[in-house]
Every structure is written in structure tokens, then in C-alpha cells.
Amino acid sequence: MAGHSKWANIQHRKGRQDEKRGKIWTRIIREIVVAARAGGGDTAMNPRLRLAIDKAKAANMPADRIKYNVDKATGNQEGVSYEEIRYEGYGIGGAAIIIDTMTDNRVRTVAEVRHAFSKYGGNLGTDGSVSFQFKHCGQFMFAPGSSEDRIMEVALDAGAEDVVTDDDGTVEVLCAPPDFEAVQAALQAAGLVPELAEVTMRAENTVALDGEDAQRMQKLLDVLEDLDDTQAVFHNAELDE
């Protein structure tokens, strides 16, 4: 296992999010608009919208702004139409990268993604070129030192598929995407608060990178995450500190 722990990865991500809070709001608004447009504005009937609104609340987005964007998506306000597009490619050392985007201009988006790969040492691939290396799942991450036994008891009873303790002590709960809300509710009811809770693409295997290669890979990932149309970036690199 490379020296860059999962806990360090989480802290890096949270630090990046704190630096660009405005961009986080923009991404969440896109998620709300797309979810509401696809499944309607009733959160009781639209789990994707529920999750997007939960993200908005966690990011301290005002309730009136959330409501405005739900209304915009469901026809009560005029708005932009977004398209969801996934790009796949290779980073340093052949590490796999997935970029999920929402865009109102796919020509602009693919040009920006391709430019980022080309400039920072990667290659944009074709549909399906790397996604088979990932599993779509719900993921909850608890800090090193958390009670693994208690987390395991609550999570498995709620329908989680697995609970894993990583080398650095991080406790990771995995579940099928449809079970995400049930597992999350059970953990919250038990007073177990994860540092990270999301439906994600989890790498099945990793590529270890260190030194200059790790730095170059981190730069590529940061540039891809900073693109205006990017919603999420997933990868299978283990970056050595």
C-alpha cells in the first residue's frame, strides 16, 4: 500500500472543497436541477433529489436558493438545460480516471477535458475504457480510531455489503447505491458520523505512484476537478506522501 493513506486523501479533498466553496455550490445546483428535471420536485418520490438537497444543506446553501433551483428545474422558472456526460482516460503510470460532467455545451467540455489530459501527461480514452475498473457503490468513511465493531454492527444490520478497516485505521462502509439512504440513516441514528458519505465509483484495484509521478498525477486530478463543468473525478491512483 502506498504511503498516501485514504485518510490523507479525504483531508486533501476536504481542503480543496473549502478553498472553492463557490464552485461546490455551482456543482450542487446542477445536480439539483438535473435530478428535479428527471424525477420531479417531490423529494419523497425522488431519492436522487433528496441526496442533492442533503449535499446542498451540508454545504450551507440557503433554503430559498435550493427551492429556487428545484422550481427552475420543474418548470416554475426558466433555466439552462444540462446534459450529463462521462469521460474516461488514463493518467500518470496508466492510472484510470473517470470525470463526470454536467454541461450545456458538450463541445466546450470535451475540449477542456482533452486539453487537461494532454497538457498534464494523460490520455483521454473512449467510453468504457476504464470504468470496468470501478464499482458503483455507496461509501462512508470514518476517521482512524473509530469503533469498527459498532460501525460494523449498525451498518451491516442496515444493509451494508462490507465494512473494511484500512492500513491507516480508516473505517470504510460499502453498500449498494439503492441502500445508501437506509445505511446513512441508521448510522446517524446510532450517533456515528462519517467524515465522508457519498455514492461514488470505487476503484477495484489501485496503481501506486510516488515522487514526481505522484505530484504530476495530483496536478492532473486538480486541474480536471477545477474545470467548470466537472461534477466529480474518480481515480485508482495511490499517491505516496
Swiss-Prot record:
Which parts form a coiled-coil structure per UniProt?
none
Q: Which InterPro entries match?
A: Integrase-like_N, TACO1_YebC-like_2nd/3rd_dom, TACO1_YebC_N, Transcrip_reg_TACO1-like, Transcrip_reg_TACO1-like_dom3, YebC-like
What processes in GO biological process is this protein linked to? regulation of DNA-templated transcription
| Organism domain of life | Bacteria
Give GO MF terms, alphabetically: DNA binding
Q: Pfam families, from UniProt?
A: TACO1_YebC_N, Transcrip_reg
- Indicate where this protein is primarily found: cytoplasm
Alphabetical GO CC annotations of the entry are: cytosol
The region called Disordered is annotated at 1-20
| Locations listed in the record | Cytoplasm
Record keywords, A-Z? Cytoplasm, DNA-binding, Transcription, Transcription regulation
The entry sums up its family as follows:
Belongs to the TACO1 family.
Q: Which PANTHER family match?
A: TRANSCRIPTIONAL REGULATORY PROTEIN YEBC-RELATED, TRANSLATIONAL ACTIVATOR OF CYTOCHROME C OXIDASE 1
Q: What is this protein called?
A: Probable transcriptional regulatory protein Mpe_A1337
